[in-house]
């Protein structure tokens, strides 16, 4: 099991983290309108998969807003932000924060943990048990993993520059 920290305290992650060059595993998540989507729904596009515990935390909110700003203008790239929030909370967050880019989709895994388990970000213990650790994956148009960042301390932001560079390189 992979370990990360939450405020300096170790937590275990469940699942196998895909490596660059691996075929990305499919997953299911729920949009704000309660419809289900999967990775296959974004076939043929470069994807930035952003795993966050909850949009109601300050770091997750900052991260989602940052990816909305940094990736929204890149034609051919879709950002999928996956969290444990209910779709209603995601809708409220996006509305309040002015996040309405068609290139950024929020997805809830409240019904199904297939994303966090397939991508090795499922928190197995500690106070955030059942949520996803903070991570970023970039997939090319054929769903091959091109970039992976498992953020070692859950309360810190990822490397936006590296993720955006990987997405641009995958175009």
From Swiss-Prot:
Enzyme Commission (EC) number: 1.11.1.24
Enzyme class: oxidoreductase
Gene Ontology molecular-function annotations: thioredoxin peroxidase activity
Disulfide-bond pairs as recorded: 60-94
InterPro entries assigned to the protein according to its UniProt record, in alphabetical order: Redoxin, Thioredoxin-like_sf, Thioredoxin_domain, TPX, Tpx_CS, Tpx_Peroxidase_subfamily
Catalysed conversion reaction: a hydroperoxide + [thioredoxin]-dithiol = an alcohol + [thioredoxin]-disulfide + H2O
Active-site residues per Swiss-Prot or TrEMBL entry: 60
Keyword set, alphabetical order: Antioxidant, Disulfide bond, Oxidoreductase, Peroxidase, Redox-active center
Pfam families: Redoxin (PF08534)
Limits of the Thioredoxin domain: 18-169
Glycoprotein listed as a keyword: no
Top-level taxon in the UniProt lineage: Bacteria
Family indicated by similarity: Belongs to the peroxiredoxin family. Tpx subfamily.
Task of the protein: Thiol-specific peroxidase that catalyzes the reduction of hydrogen peroxide and organic hydroperoxides to water and alcohols, respectively. Plays a role in cell protection against oxidative stress by detoxifying peroxides.
Identification of the protein by name: Thiol peroxidase
